Amino acid sequence: MEPFRIHKGTAAVLMNNNIDTDQIIPKQYLKRIERTGFGKFLFDEWRYDNERHENPNFPLNAPDRKGASILITGDNFGCGSSREHAPWALADYGFRVIIAGGFADIFYMNCMKNGMLPIVMDKEMREKLAKTDAREQIEVDLENEVITTSTHRFHFTIEKMWKEKLLNGLDEISITMQYEQEIKEYERRIAVY
């Protein structure tokens, strides 16, 4: 996993509350286990009409929001079933940071495990951040837990364990591999039955 220290990017705004994992990526696209290729199906039923033409009224389809890597959204983001495909779709689309009023617990952990930073922020702060010009680069500094725009500076908090994993680009496998020598020594010592 790539370390996450400072991210600079533009933001897309989708302030709906209770966006569930089926709205993030509909179930018909979950027939694969690869982590890539899901971005084109992100918010599929909102982004496209029945003939797969972009819905011009959907915020992510606005020309000045294309290529955004920060998503500012409502409360309880990622609720519903615990499909890891939802964070995969967000990451594959290009999002590195999701800022919401809150997250479903499993979705929150899945974001972290996939190298994305989910940030919990109150509504007033999110509304200020959402007013940032669509072309402005927003800086998200994980180490100092600060989001900076040209006019505002917002502080956020993150659990130390998750912060360290993201800063160092560690997933479960790489953490396990830090103990490779100890594991080999243990395997050498145990009796074989």
From Swiss-Prot:
Pathway(s): Amino-acid biosynthesis; L-leucine biosynthesis; L-leucine from 3-methyl-2-oxobutanoate: step 2/4
An annotated GO BP: L-leucine biosynthetic process
Organism superkingdom: Bacteria
A Pfam match: Aconitase_C
Keyword Amino-acid biosynthesis recorded: yes
Catalytic reaction(s) noted: (2R,3S)-3-isopropylmalate = (2S)-2-isopropylmalate
CC annotations in GO: 3-isopropylmalate dehydratase complex
GO molecular function: 3-isopropylmalate dehydratase activity
Keyword RNA-binding: no
Keywords: Amino-acid biosynthesis, Branched-chain amino acid biosynthesis, Leucine biosynthesis, Lyase
Group of enzyme by EC: lyase
EC number: 4.2.1.33
Reported function: Catalyzes the isomerization between 2-isopropylmalate and 3-isopropylmalate, via the formation of 2-isopropylmaleate.
PANTHER family cross-referenced by the UniProt entry: 3-ISOPROPYLMALATE DEHYDRATASE SMALL SUBUNIT (PTHR43345:SF5), 3-ISOPROPYLMALATE DEHYDRATASE SMALL SUBUNIT 2-RELATED-RELATED (PTHR43345)
Subunit structure: Heterodimer of LeuC and LeuD.
HAMAP family reported in the protein's UniProt record: LeuD_type1
Family assignment from sequence similarity: Belongs to the LeuD family. LeuD type 1 subfamily.
Protein known as: 3-isopropylmalate dehydratase small subunit
Gene that this sequence comes from: leuD
